[in-house]
């Protein structure tokens, strides 16, 4: 009886810790969101947001960009957390399935085909179709070959390598103007995002909300295939559904900002180190942390240089690569 009471007390204490942590993350998110609207080459404080200058810089330029950054950051972070549970691999991240490079191949092809003047809506649709094509191929392998998580992971890596090689070949044979545009896009950037691109943001948020509410299923999947099946989870159904959702999230994110690495790997690990182990609270925390984490990276990319902007993919890679190496050394058995 006493042991049961102790367990209940521990569960209650953990829930309080998780809710306090989510409250702190919410405050941090709102603070960074506020700073992102103010910051830029010209700082504009809230008392001038509705002036003529504020109408242009805050509401027409910065606000749609901030929304896109939040959507992409939340998407990649949630996708990373889902993949780490799905593949039972602590080093899994959105690019690992090859979905990012699959989307990139179509975008690179369209840029070359239209000599660098392809409309954004066409590039966006192409990125989504490329991501979904790779995802459907993975689903076909999974359905017909009944691949386990480890083998499906290796198939995704193979697709990523093949897609990356194909992109390199296309860039190599492009003209100098196309090459400059392609290389900048492949490094990740939110430059040029405005209200015309918000249909992609609107498409991302329902997926983010749905995935962030699947913590119970992911808790079961993280126990392993055998135990999840014993608990009544249909591995085939849920694994394929999650792979499809992750592919859609990553495809839309690539359409908005190009390839952005490491954020889907690093942030879920940091949250786990802070004591968030239950996916029912980890996933909402990933939404908040991914949003303000990529906003911070975007602030660095905008403010690091005068009259220039560092690609955000360079910022995330610079900050994330040392953490990835540390995780690689820390996780000794992840096969």
Curated annotation (Swiss-Prot):
The keyword NAD does not apply. One of its GO terms (biological process) is cobalamin transport. Coiled coil: none annotated. The chain crosses the membrane at residues 21-43, 63-82, 95-114, 119-141, 153-175, 195-212, 244-266, 281-303, 310-329. The keyword rRNA processing does not apply. One of its GO terms (cellular component) is plasma membrane. GO terms for molecular function: vitamin transmembrane transporter activity. It comes from the Bacteria. It is found in: Cell inner membrane. Its main location: membrane. Keywords: Cell inner membrane, Cell membrane, Membrane, Transmembrane, Transmembrane helix, Transport. It is a multi-pass membrane protein. PANTHER family: FERRIC ENTEROBACTIN TRANSPORT SYSTEM PERMEASE PROTEIN, VITAMIN B12 IMPORT SYSTEM PERMEASE PROTEIN BTUC. Part of the ABC transporter complex BtuCDF involved in vitamin B12 import. Involved in the translocation of the substrate across the membrane. Belongs to the binding-protein-dependent transport system permease family. FecCD subfamily. The complex is composed of two ATP-binding proteins (BtuD), two transmembrane proteins (BtuC) and a solute-binding protein (BtuF). HAMAP family: BtuC. This is Vitamin B12 import system permease protein BtuC. It comes from Photorhabdus laumondii subsp. laumondii (strain DSM 15139 / CIP 105565 / TT01). The gene is btuC.
């Amino acid at each position: 009886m006493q042991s049961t009471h102790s367990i209940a007390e521990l569960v209650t204490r953990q829930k309080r810790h998780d809710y306090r942590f989510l409250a702190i993350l919410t405050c941090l998110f709102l603070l960074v969101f506020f700073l992102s609207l103010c910051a830029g080459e010209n700082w504009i404080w809230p008392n001038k947001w509705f002036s003529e200058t504020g109408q242009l810089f805050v509401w027409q330029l910065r606000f749609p960009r901030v929304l896109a950054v939040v959507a992409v950051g939340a998407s990649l972070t949630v996708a990373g957390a889902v993949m780490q549970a799905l593949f039972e691999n602590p080093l899994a991240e959105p690019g690992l399935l090859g979905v990012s490079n699959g989307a990139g191949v179509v975008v690179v092809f369209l840029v070359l085909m239209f000599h660098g003047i392809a409309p954004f809506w066409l590039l966006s649709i192409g990125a989504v179709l490329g991501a979904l094509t790779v995802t459907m191929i993975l689903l076909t392998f999974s359905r017909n070959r009944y691949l386990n998580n480890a083998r499906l992971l290796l198939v995704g890596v193979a697709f990523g390598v093949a897609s990356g090689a194909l992109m390199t070949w296309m860039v190599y044979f492009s003209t100098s103007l196309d090459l400059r545009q392609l290389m900048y896009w492949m490094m990740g950037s939110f430059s040029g995002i405005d209200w015309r691109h918000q249909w992609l943001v609107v498409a991302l948020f329902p997926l983010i909300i749905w995935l962030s509410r699947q913590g119970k299923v992911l808790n079961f999947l993280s126990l392993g295939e055998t135990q999840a099946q014993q608990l009544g989870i249909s591995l085939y159904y849920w694994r394929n559904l999650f792979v499809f959702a992750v592919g859609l999230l990553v495809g839309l994110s690539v359409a908005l900002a190009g390839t952005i690495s490491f954020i889907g790997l690093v942030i879920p690990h940091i949250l786990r180190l802070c004591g968030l182990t239950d996916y029912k609270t980890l996933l909402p925390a990933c939404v908040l942390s991914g949003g303000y984490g990529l906003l911070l990276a975007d602030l660095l990319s905008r403010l690091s240089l005068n009259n220039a902007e560092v690609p955000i993919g360079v910022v995330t890679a610079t900050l994330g690569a040392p953490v990835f190496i540390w995780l690689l050394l820390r996780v000794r058995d992840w096969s």
